[in-house]
Amino acid sequence: MKNLPSKALSVAVSLALAAALPVVSEAQSAATKHQQAVLVTGASSGIGRKITERLAADGYFVYATARKDDDLKALGAIKNVQAVRLDVTKPQDIDAAVQTIKSGGRGLYGLVNNAGIGSDASVAEMKLEEFDLMMAVNMYGPYRMTQAFEPLIVEAKGRITNIGSISGILASPGLSAYAMSKHAIEAFTDSLAQELAPLGATANVVEPGNYNTDIVKNEIERGVAPPGTSADLSMDKPPDEVADAVEKALFEPNPKRRYLVVPIQRQAEKTIRKQIEQLVQLNEGQPYTYDHDALIKMLDEALSTARPRTK
């Protein structure tokens, strides 16, 4: 065999090595060059807008959804944000969003099911059409979005964060439909987390109190806000703490199943007390009632297995 000139030999070796390496698609290449991507629904205002701004500012890439042209334009002007037109009640919008994200080549690490609407009517007063719309947005919306995007989340070993509410725990008159929809998110998240765990993915729920958002303002004006709501301290606070909780739920190493985040201590106390009251009611009067000592032992065991607080 003839000796090849050194330049030709170098080229031959390079070609041989290139042939031995796996082919990297354009999508794979793009995914390695960009930040982790998160999809946030209902990003035009309130909690969704704050989540979008926080994640984008911290270097994550955010697909932020909205329905109106002006909102899409405003979201698209934020660095690290791509605005996506999406109405969670429209399957065709969801399908189009899936294709948009797939074609982006970044994959999808996180899904934040935030889109929601409020109500201010009792069961007797609420029209069935209003009830149907609320369930379509608040309950069916997260379900549809999760079905559509779960394959991408599982592929990335990522996380799904649902935005619940303390109204899912602290029901009050005039909020029956809203409380129902948010309580459904609690159960949905618990089941979803168990389904995702064997696949290496995670689901959790962030439960905000009454921050300065349009939904809470409307509840206060109508006099149907959950117990513990006031027009003073809580209304002075924008939902920055909610964005903090969502970022932790998405990215901290050992995420919790639930993140309670409220603007004032009174709301935290009422929420925890309500859970304790429900525990007492469940335990009382059934064939396998636990006594005081047994309940305290259960509480101690639960506290001992809880995550240590980070300073």
Label the model's feature ranges.
Residues 44-45:
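Conserved glycine-rich cofactor-binding loop
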Residues 198-260:
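SDR active-site lid
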Residues 170, 191-202:
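Active-site-adjacent segment of SDR/Rossmann-fold oxidoreductases
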Residues 122-123, 130-132, 157:
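Substrate-binding pocket helix/loop in short-chain dehydrogenase/reductase
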Residues 146, 181:
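Active-site helix of classical SDR
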Residues 165:
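Residue(s) in the substrate-gating loop at a strand-loop-helix junction
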Residues 86-96, 128:
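The beta1-alpha1 cofactor-binding region of Rossmann-like NAD(H)/NADP(H)-dependent oxidoreductases
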